[in-house]
Amino acid sequence: MPGIGLDELPAGNDAEILNLFGGGSIVSRLAALGFVPGMRVSMVQNRGHGPLIVSVINTRVALGRREAVSIRARRITA
């Protein structure tokens, strides 16, 4: 599987969404929130446990770890 799970992205880093995996309801919810292939996101908070806060389309979204694992992304380096 290319890329990393979004749960692995440290706070303060950006990534490009590569793909979504998981059950249809999870994928549908994530896509509705803007987590679609090609979208750039920024990790606001990732403490290694509990929910993450991700900025997508200028909106902060709280994701559970299970949801974040379903998102494959490519880290963007400056």
PLM region descriptions:
Residues 2, 25-29:
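Short alpha-helix capping/helix-loop boundary micro-motifs
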Residues 4, 23, 45-50:
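Short, charged beta-turn/beta-strand-edge "cap" motif at the junction between a beta-strand
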Residues 8-21:
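Short, basic/aromatic beta-hairpin or loop at an interaction surface
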Residues 12, 46-78:
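C-terminal structural segments of small proteins and small subunits
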Residues 37-43:
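Conserved beta-strand/loop element in small beta-rich adapter and peptidoglycan-binding domains
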